[in-house]
Amino acid sequence: MKQTITEKIFSDHVGKEVSAGEIIESKIDMIIGNDITTPISIKQFERSGATKLANPDGFAIVMDHYIPTKDILSANQAKISREFAYKHDLKNYFDEKDMGIEHALLPEKGLVIPGDVIIGADSHTCTHGALGAFSTGMGSTDLAYAMITGKNWFKVPESIKVVFKGKLDKHVYGKDLILEIIRQIGVDGALYKALEFSGEVIEGLSMDDRFSMCNMAIEAGAKSGIIAVDEITKEFLKDKNLRDKPKFFYSDEGAKYDKILEIDVTNLDPVIAYPFLPSNGKSVRQAVRDDLAIDQAFIGSCTNGRLSDLRIAAQILKGKKVARKTRLIITPATQKIARAAEKEGLIDIFIEAGAVVSNPTCGACLGGYMGILGANERCISTTNRNFVGRMGDRTSEIYLANSAVVAASAIAGKIADPRDL
């Protein structure tokens, strides 16, 4: 039987050939929890009477949404995960001593391996498909079941193959590719499907761009996003202390897909997702014509807080100043990224431009802290969601964009095209 990469990964884990639509129980290689969702999993774990994790080394807790904690409630919530991690002597517990947003930190630590089946109690767990793994978000109770048994059940998803061809223009990145897909198919256009990204454009993308694309697969309703391993993937993995041996799977010629989409990116401009859906994409040229003044610009998150994003922003901000009526917040996705940015002089460029640089955290993206929007404020952001009230007051607006557009907009005080600078 001809199989997709997703069908092959599940077949390997189940020990028999499976196909899309089948209900299976699969071994889980890595379970990911965070400070918001893990306490619920812990409660269910303890309620079940379980005393031991099925696979302690395959469980990671990352304190990232409120780190350091912002108030008494978040401090008490963090305490639950912290005490559980100490009680079970978790090797993969990450807090203030080694901070990072989970979906940037785990690949950095070598905890995501090609061929894995990964679940996390966070919808953007699909990020890790960029490394040729099946990775998806699940509920906290599903996480608890996997903590106890080391397994979970799935319906093997059908796949949508997206083939990108052409050549990217300057300041068009992976973020623009995924926003364009979502614009074309809508927020439910890939419901419970595996979005498989391929083509000559993908072959030339950096890992950072690939992570951005897979991260936002969920915004099209997808169960997962996935990119087959190639030389760029292998180069990324080369210096990682991988917890296990990787397995490389590739879709067969003639494998069955729900649909195949072909997208020519040759004339694609940077894409801006207008409020209040990631599918509300428009060209940056349209946004410039709309003359949209901004109160806040944000660069960070598990979508676009990586080193390449900071480098792109620094190139644009160097020698410039953030507009008087605009504030720019920059949040590196991990401590390693923050340190690298500091060594390269990027942090100095940001501060001299008038930006504030925070520690790694999810904070602003979910409207938690470190960048909450007030009434009627408008923000251009490298994050992944622009729903009503996502980053603050229900009357505020979020426009999603790549890091170059956000940096250029911070200087202009309104949404701007970095190619015009």
Task: Label the model's feature ranges.
Residues 1-421:
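Fe-S-dependent hydro-lyases/dehydratases of central metabolism
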